[in-house]
Amino acid sequence: MNTLYRKKLIVLAIVATFTSQFSFGKVQQSASKKDQILSQITIRGEKIAAPNVDGESKAGAASILSDTASLLENIPGMSLYKAGGLSSLPSLHGLADDRLRIQVDGMNLISACANHMNPPLSYIDPSNVGNVQVLNGIAPVSSGGDSIGGTIKVNSSASVFANEDQGNILKGQAGVFFRSNSHARGANVNANYATPSFSFNYSAAVAKADNYLAAKSFKLNGLSALGSVTSGREVGSSAYQSENHALGFAIRGSDQLLELKLGLQDIPLQGFPNQRMDMTRNRSEQINLHYRQQLEWGNVDARIYHEQTQHRMNFSDDKQYWYGNAPGMPMETAGHNTGAVLKADWVLSERDKLILGSELQRYRMNDWWNASGTGMMMAPNTFINIKDGERNRLAIFAEWETQWSPTWFSQLGVRSERVRMDSGAVAGYNNMAYGDPTSTTSIPGIFNHSDRQGNDHNIDVSAVFRFAPDSNFSVDGGYAYKTRSPNLYERYTWANSNTMVMNMNNWFGDGNGYVGNLQLKPEIAQTLSATIHWQNFVDSGIEFKLAPFYTRVRDYIDAVACSSIGKICAARKDGFVNLSLSNQQAELFGIDLSFEKTLAQSRDFGKIHAKGGINYVRGENTQTRTGLYNIMPLNAKFSLQQQIDRWTNTLEWQVVNAKSHVSEIRRELNTSGYALVNLRASYDFQQGRIDFGVENLTNRFYSLPLGGAYLGQGATMGMGVPHGTTVPGVGRSMYVSGTWKF
């Protein structure tokens, strides 16, 4: 019997045991004081209630999207590394990927891939998202550690229960969508059955898309791989296909809630136009048990979860598959992630609250590349990229919240965390080309005889203050000291034998080759941040936020020349470079501005209001005085929206400045500025909703500022793709979606 399914049976038995001890009755419906305070003190992040993100208002975006990270695009300070069609990486104030703590239904998920093709947000379908909370770099220590850029919490829809006088509930909804560019199509369903004390939910979603087209040709027409021809507009390796299933069970008593969520994901294909490989299979199984109890003195919250991923990469149709007699380059990763969180909060007085908690995470990963063909390049043995990789986290934290007066609030927190890492012995495809793994002088041998165990003792501190003299004006400010340890790939990728193997370890999308560094130290970030918030909806219908920030990072992990850390890497003639990693110094600063204003309201024209936001961030390596990689240039978004009867109509204008402050060591590409126009409309009716519109209405050609280097076709394994082409954005695309409730 499958190991995970044995675990599921055990958990179901635990649920049955809890059920027998529950006192069934109506659960208290009011939010806890802790939840109310947290939403108040979050700096430039909140329990999102903006259109297209939370609850019913997110329906329009979720109904046409396949990429959950895209739900965050309108959050101030947020940008996206565009990668595969399902796997964008969020970046908050210039810090992305593992520098952010990303939780899905409370689970701290980890990307099990040398190219980070399966980031945490790819494990939940947009149609299953109930709410999102974004907390920036001065987030409370209880929101998660081992990160320096902030926390993103994505939760599926909350468990539904019937009222005592309502009887049983059976309801749900189903949806379909189509996008003209890439012929993207998909369907989803969500069904609920509930009594006053029991809740059951099932959700499923499927999505499929072909390669998308840019607004104009950015390369030559022709043969991209054997049997595959791409046009000059076609972005190779941008197709995808996915399937997601989720089951939820919940029982509640008068002061208790127990939830069990099971998840299954299968992605048979996801192309990556900025990677040399493509995802040819990703299967994930998740089990998540959550318990919460309200007591006289406060609340207890406990969670235990397990997630396992089987991930495969190779070349899809647009990339060359045969190299001599070698059929592709199969790469596999197996990740096993187990975690537990225990948290309790005590109401000490009407003024003070104390939150104490502990967190445990145990992660195991193997990354290997099976032999291909009979030549010396990829045979006859299995290439061991990371063997028995271990990354264990154990943390304790405490927070003290004080409502000093009706106008002043503070939250102080400290977190102590130990991160222990290790890995086993490695080996190349053969000893002649890659070195004898038992020798003390070969590349794998030096790694195998090194001390590979890492023990990091990390400290996080946060201090947040809020001044709100009235309901229309508030000032939030704070300081945070946050720490992140390197991930397994940053420390334990060892191979610098040739360009081919270095190309395969790249989680940046820049086309370069990378080798890790056993000597990496944790990153330490100090952040100062503030938000000025003014609103007056009664008199003038206006809201305004201004939020500056500054972050200094000690031991920032950045790309360096191999020679600077004592490694010898092959030179290249294709414009890309082979690099390693080292601790540097960096700083990031910027400002977010957002506003909303009601312009007019009448019976004939409905409500018309304007929204807008401007985001600026600058990131710099202060040792080299060059730009940090993938920093979003100055950008703004403005929209004019009309709401009349059941119709909502939106005209949106997005403007992005040119990107020229780039990472020189990586030969990061500059991009030009651009402006896009989007037109959207939706119609709500009692049993559902219809959305339709046009993205990139004027069919403007542009390069994605955070899209990386174009590697979507051809002989990508070695040096067959020249440097210098950026990944273009999507050309004009019409869409339509429908959601029906039952």
Each PLM stretch: what is its role?
Residues 403-410, 418-419, 537-538, 542-562, ...:
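Gram-negative outer-membrane beta-barrel transporters
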Residues 37-71, 89-91, 97:
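N-terminal periplasmic "start-of-domain" segments of outer-membrane beta-barrel proteins
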Residues 180-209, 219-268, 279, 283-297, ...:
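Transmembrane beta-barrel wall of Gram-negative outer-membrane proteins
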Residues 215, 483-484, 559-561, 657-661, ...:
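C-terminal beta-signal and adjacent terminal beta-strands/loops
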Residues 109-138:
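Short acidic/polar hinge/loop motifs at secondary-structure boundaries
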Residues 135, 277-296, 329-337, 385-393, ...:
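Outer-membrane beta-barrel signature, preferentially recognizing the C-terminal barrel domain
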Residues 238-242, 255-300, 308-337, 375, ...:
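Flexible loop and strand-edge segments within Gram-negative outer membrane beta-barrel domains
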Residues 127-131, 136, 141-218, 239-243:
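Outer-membrane beta-barrel translocator/receptor signature
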